[in-house]
């Protein structure tokens, strides 16, 4: 009887493993197909996809999802205009990576390391707290007159993927335009990607 239970457990575990893999592969294919249809000239391989309505960041390696992170985008929704405090949409790339080897909780102001460590609050929501912590990666728009140039320039707006001292808000819209992540997550992502990696932001 015991051996039968072990065999049944083995096959259930095996089924769960392949079911999960199949699910991720299906999601990967759907996202890759969607991006390819919108950006047919863009060669896809390693890239970041951010879904604003999902409040999720997907890291793709070789066109397969390798990591999924909860994020927090703008409390005001999606938009590309300067001074809108909205999260921009479209094709971007990571232009700068700042904060390598900085301790968790390091405070950054105007992309400079202040050498101060702030408290990471994972218990309470502070809507007005907008501290940039641990790591930041600035985004540059790649689409002229959509997120690059004039009054819609993402880089001039100072839009980053960054850590936050207000981790309780992760998973719900609460930022002033940037993409916030938990501090351990931003370190992992920072170490996993290179500058110029494509970043696709969609309101879905």
Regions found by a protein language model. Give the residues of each.
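Hydrophobic helical h-region of N-terminal Sec-dependent signal peptides
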Residues: 6-10
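N-terminal pre-domains immediately preceding structured catalytic cores
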Residues: 2-4, 14-204
């Amino acid at each position: 009887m015991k051996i039968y239970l072990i065999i049944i457990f083995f096959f259930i575990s095996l089924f769960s493993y392949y079911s999960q893999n199949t699910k991720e592969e299906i999601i990967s294919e759907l996202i890759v197909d969607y991006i390819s249809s919108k950006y047919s000239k863009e060669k896809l391989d390693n890239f970041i996809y951010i879904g604003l309505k999902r409040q999720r960041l997907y890291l793709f390696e070789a066109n397969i999802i390798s990591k999924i992170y909860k994020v927090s985008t703008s409390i005001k929704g999606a938009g590309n205009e300067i001074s809108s405090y909205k999260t921009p949409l479209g094709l971007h790339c990571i232009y700068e990576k700042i904060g390598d080897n900085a301790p968790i909780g390091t405070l950054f102001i105007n992309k400079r390391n202040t050498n101060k460590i702030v408290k990471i609050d994972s218990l309470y929501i502070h809507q007005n707290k907008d501290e940039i912590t641990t790591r930041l990666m600035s985004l540059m728009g790649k689409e002229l007159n959509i997120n690059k140039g004039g009054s819609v320039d993402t880089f001039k707006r100072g839009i980053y993927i960054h850590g936050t001292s207000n981790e309780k808000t992760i998973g719900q819209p609460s930022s002033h335009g940037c993409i916030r992540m938990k501090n351990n997550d931003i370190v992992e992502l920072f170490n996993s990607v290179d500058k110029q990696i494509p970043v696709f932001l969609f309101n879905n």
